[in-house]
Amino acid sequence: MAEKPAQEQEQKRAMEPAVLDDIIRRLVEFRNTRPGSGKQVHLSEGEIRQLCAVSKEIFLQQPNLLELEAPIKICGDIHGQYSDLLRLFEYGGFPPEANYLFLGDYVDRGKQSLETICLLLAYKIKYPENFFLLRGNHESASINRIYGFYDECKRRFNVRLWKIFTDCFNCLPVAALIDDRILCMHGGISPELKSLDQIRNIARPMDIPESGLVCDLLWSDPSGDVGWGMNDRGVSYTFGADKVAEFLEKHDMDLICRAHQVVEDGYEFFAERQLVTVFSAPNYCGEFDNAGAMMSIDESLMCSFQILKPSEKKSPFL
């Protein structure tokens, strides 16, 4: 078998701690800049490639269904709203002050997808057993080719770098189980999901299929209707409160925690508090008045919420 190129071999090795710490320092220092200044964090293409290569190996070493323990903080969609990601860490504590699980959709729509994903990958490498990232439906080439990440990579670097991110995203895990009681994913449950071993056995790297279990985990939505229904997104299904209750009872769990939908208060319960949606990008896309939220789960599995309020609408003349 042909040897892998030396450059790729080199990148897969653990990053020098000093290099990693310097990347994190530059990314976090951004919080001292004036909001709306348009300033970007400068990372080299080589540094970003190494973040992708090293984190990808960690994702593949860890299971596709992460088994985690409380206490832990859970964050929903970020969508390139980098200043808001830093605000979440200011509220919850910068790693390793707290354990974190992010539910996907790091890129697209916002202005700083690159800073957002680079800081998250850097923390994953620095704290692999305390910091966890799931895959969202936007961590997919067919989606982020359209909704902004491809254009940001091309404008700031090149298309090659976007392809390297695609390879990394194809290795992200798709679900997490907290203390055997709380199941977390980006989208929701699937009519095909009969056993958690189905998630454990999904081979990676993989692209997100157009239908089936993985597609549903990343795309499905709760609905006021009963049973399984057609999803307005044109992908996957909707599921009623009856399906949530049925799933939790069958698997002896208490709660499903997911993201994927903008909710006004940053979090919203469904199915008599058996499912919660967490969305962490306030003033989403500058078009919504929503708050963002982070869910904290303590050792006794009590859930509480920290809220990022939407900013006041500023008059353009002030």
From Swiss-Prot:
Superkingdom, taxonomy of origin: Eukaryota
Cofactor(s) this protein requires: Mn(2+)
Chief localization: nucleus
Protein residues bound to Mn(2+) 2: D105, N137, H186, H260
Enzyme Commission number: 3.1.3.16
SUPFAM superfamilies attached to this UniProt entry: Metallo-dependent phosphatases
Pfam families assigned: Metallophos, STPPase_N
Textual note on the cofactor: Binds 2 manganese ions per subunit.
GO cellular component: nucleus; protein phosphatase type 1 complex
Catalytically driven reaction(s): O-phospho-L-seryl-[protein] + H2O = L-seryl-[protein] + phosphate; O-phospho-L-threonyl-[protein] + H2O = L-threonyl-[protein] + phosphate
Expression across tissues: Expressed in cotyledons, leaves and flowers.
Protein location: Nucleus; Cytoplasm
Catalytic residues (positions): H138
Disruption of the gene: reported phenotype: No visible phenotype under normal growth conditions, but mutant seedlings exhibit hypersensitivity to abscisic acid (ABA) or salt treatments.
Positions of transmembrane segments: none
One MF term in the entry's GO annotations: protein serine/threonine phosphatase activity
Protein keywords: Cytoplasm, Hydrolase, Manganese, Metal-binding, Nucleus, Protein phosphatase
Activity regulation description: Phosphatase activity is strongly reduced by PYL11, an abscisic acid (ABA) receptor.
Binding site for Mn(2+) 1: D77, H79, D105
Free-text function comment from the UniProt entry: Serine/threonine-protein phosphatase that possesses phosphatase activity toward para-nitrophenyl phosphate (pNPP) in vitro. Acts as a negative regulator of abscisic acid (ABA) signaling. In vitro, can dephosphorylate and inhibit the kinase activity of SRK2E/SNRK2.6, an activator of ABA signaling.
Family: Belongs to the PPP phosphatase family. PP-1 subfamily.
PANTHER family tied to this protein: SERINE/THREONINE PROTEIN PHOSPHATASE, SERINE_THREONINE-PROTEIN PHOSPHATASE
Protein name: Serine/threonine-protein phosphatase PP1 isozyme 1
Organism in which the protein naturally occurs: Arabidopsis thaliana
